[in-house]
């Protein structure tokens, strides 16, 4: 039976406890990752969004009733533990940020029991996607997905702070609007008040941000939800989020400068250094050098113009293209 957490206050998250806290009393709450009963001692790995902490239950520091409860713990039980931070008496676990310490429990409350989950709550799960989506609330407990959402949150905070420092105002624009010409089909929402009429969900805040420029708000941004009634593909999402901005009284170099510095700070969150200025090329230069308007410059596979070399070769495909004003280009694979 689930117990109440009344009277308990979590003091910190699992990975926030360090060697400097040895000897201190802490209260942790989270999910049981796994439990190992060694007879007179029970080891439990307690997990929350910050990481994992090893909890030790022994008769003496914890009551007999508490020890019996600990013996029944299973994966994904939600528990609250009070105890003392200790240096690990056994081998240090170098795979954990908390691998040098553990909590010797003196109190345990089972806040919620759990049935056996349909798949292991662990990183790099091999579970089929349809099963993971069916139990999405369990899938989102996995550390790799939690890291993604935590990083996304950090990026959003960074973007807001950076653009605020640059003089931008965060202004929300309407979601329910009339249909306007865009690059895809609109999602339509029927109106209850006006039967037979429909709202359109925005494919972008384009018109609204242009109106804001007319209204004197010379630097606007929002982290905007956008909707496009398209099939789901690798580069197409029916619902997506974008960093949307608009500036007045600037030229193209001003826009590029703001975005370059923002990208540099965003990539720094994942320890990737982006030297500035970012190399630039015109569309024509990209097509001439790489044959693409979105070239992958990592490999240096540039096109070489061999028109003069092959113009008299007698090969109809080449000579025909040259006679019509075209050129012959190829990649040097040597």
Tell me what each language-model feature is.
Residues 1-334:
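Class II aminoacyl-tRNA synthetase catalytic cores and aaRS-like
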